């Protein structure tokens, strides 16, 4: 019996057991001045094409270095986010598309500044023109609202409207006008439990939601500035493009000490429907996406 006690005691002393549950949490997201953050993102996406034409696979990786400083407006924090790495591989029917990742590679070394309010909600993106440069492909892929979406996906898309405890849930709803359509997400977070992640005490938050896209509510400014984008939008409308089914599930780990989300695993599945432009026959395009995000923090020396 004594040897068994000696074996168990170190685990108790050094906290190898489960984390103690915390009540009345609001999960504020903080970007602390004097800390440098490194965020890594990996995305894998696959779309199935009809009629045995082969599918489309996309692999994307990004690494962003984030340095916060006190904002110019009271109660805000401005976080300069520099792209240290960005790459994408695109395959059609199993064959790699040459130059598929060139637009993303052009981001390396560039930066944007994200402005957050006191509770960590992103309110503004600065320096978008510098980030996009004169690349029309990047301009069609990204704007301020889509950048807000990417930043939000790595954190909480909606915070609780009241203090919550393990077992509680809350809903969220967000909209992001994109260059050629409007993207909307709605869903529910559940504060499932507390657990240790690599020795760090975290809240495990479970996500369950849906995604919608509307081609009638795109970014009008982008359409007028980019004739090719406007032409592509009209083509989508004429094809009756819509999302008929969608599901988003995921798990996030919120670090209590850091006051930020340090790990995100998210799965998205969509079923898109449209008409074949040559035959006018209805097409169904299932698409699956897996996104992983990690956040590391290091105090400035």
What are these regions (language model features)?
Residues 8-16:
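Bacterial N-terminal signal peptides
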């Amino acid at each position: 019996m004594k040897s068994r006690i000696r074996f168990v005691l170190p685990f108790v002393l050094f906290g190898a057991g489960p984390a103690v549950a915390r009540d009345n949490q609001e999960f504020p997201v903080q970007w602390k001045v004097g800390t440098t953050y490194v965020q890594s993102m990996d995305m894998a996406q696959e779309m199935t094409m009809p009629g045995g034409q082969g599918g489309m696979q996309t692999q994307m990786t990004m690494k962003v270095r984030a340095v916060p400083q006190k904002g110019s407006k009271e109660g805000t924090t401005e976080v300069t986010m520099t792209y240290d790495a960005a790459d994408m591989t695109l395959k059609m029917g199993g064959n790699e598309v040459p130059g598929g990742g060139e637009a993303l590679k052009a981001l390396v070394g560039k930066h944007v500044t994200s402005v957050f309010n006191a509770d960590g909600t992103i309110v503004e993106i600065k320096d978008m023109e510098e980030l996009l440069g004169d690349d029309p492909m990047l301009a069609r892929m990204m704007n301020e609202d889509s950048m807000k979406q990417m930043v939000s996906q790595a954190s909480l898309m909606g915070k609780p409207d009241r203090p919550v405890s393990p077992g509680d849930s809350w809903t969220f709803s967000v909209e992001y006008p994109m260059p050629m359509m409007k993207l909307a997400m709605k869903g529910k977070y559940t504060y499932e439990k507390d657990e240790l992640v690599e020795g760090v005490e975290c809240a495990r938050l479970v996500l369950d939601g849906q995604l919608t896209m509307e081609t009638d509510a795109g970014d009008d400014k982008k359409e007028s500035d980019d004739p090719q984008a406007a032409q592509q939008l009209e083509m989508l409308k004429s094809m009756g493009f819509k999302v008929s089914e969608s599901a988003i599930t995921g798990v996030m780990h919120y670090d209590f000490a850091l006051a930020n989300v340090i790990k995100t695993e998210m799965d998205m599945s969509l079923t898109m429907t449209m008409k074949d432009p040559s035959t006018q026959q209805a097409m169904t395009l299932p698409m699956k996406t897996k996104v992983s995000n990690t956040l590391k923090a290091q105090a400035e020396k």
